[in-house]
Amino acid sequence: MSYLYKAFGWVLDLCYKIVPNYLVAILLFALIIKIVMFPLGIKQQKNSQKQARLRPKELAIRKKYAGRNDKATQQKAQQEIMELYQKENYSMFGGCLPLLIQFPIIIALYNVIRNPLQYMLGIAGDNLTKIQEIFMSLTGAERVMTDLEMMPTIRANFSEFAAYMNGITLDKVPSFNIGAFDLSVTPNASGVSNWYLLIPILTFVFAFGSMKLTKKFTYQAPQAEGTNNALSMKIMDITMPLFSAWIAYTLPSVIGVYWMFQNVLSTVQQIILSQMFKIPKFTEEDYKQAERELAGSSKKNKKAEKAH
């Protein structure tokens, strides 16, 4: 992971050098990362497209067992659906690999953003430890969670830290001030202006809006009757944005800002992918044809069983 941290840190530092405004640099950084990960989005969309093509046949199977909620019947329906997937060379887990690949990348991204001294400026080891000790001495803090929380103190008292900054001058230290806002400030910190509460509130709004919009451009697989999937999805629609807001409330404001940018870019990406790889639409006749094919297949199987 350390190589990934260094690579992302180099990209973020390059963005800041190109545009010496941290808000714009974060947006540029988020855009670059989204472009790099775009092929994973393509793979997911293609997998959804393939699943959507099987929708009439899958719904025909579910309709065949509709109204019978006993365990044996539900297992039989699920078995037939899995056999359909196997026959059509569709894997339910085909869309999981991109998500699994993205997970460590997301962790690396947030670590890089939270620790600019280490990953943007390359300060580590004894020098970083000494900087942390000076920070705690000046502020009375008992510990240091991230580099971001030290940045305002370092800029305000740069002479105290200069000897341990690897020759980096004050003008090279990233400024997190955007107008009256300091993006290195944590919204739940004591003595912080209530205006910083806008960050977690907006993070929730962006996350919730992005989730709703993305769903409109994403294939939604049919659910079996009598399951709790619909309720679970509704709960997720609220809990995930709330989780985003909590993270934005308890971590430096720049994390919330980055999360907002990512939500916007993810929504735009899904809209683009939905146009590149369109989900097929079916008529009522298509669904009836699938039911007739299923009925015909069932009759053939029964005849074959009797013959044996």
What are these regions (language model features)?
Residues 1-308:
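Helix-loop-helix
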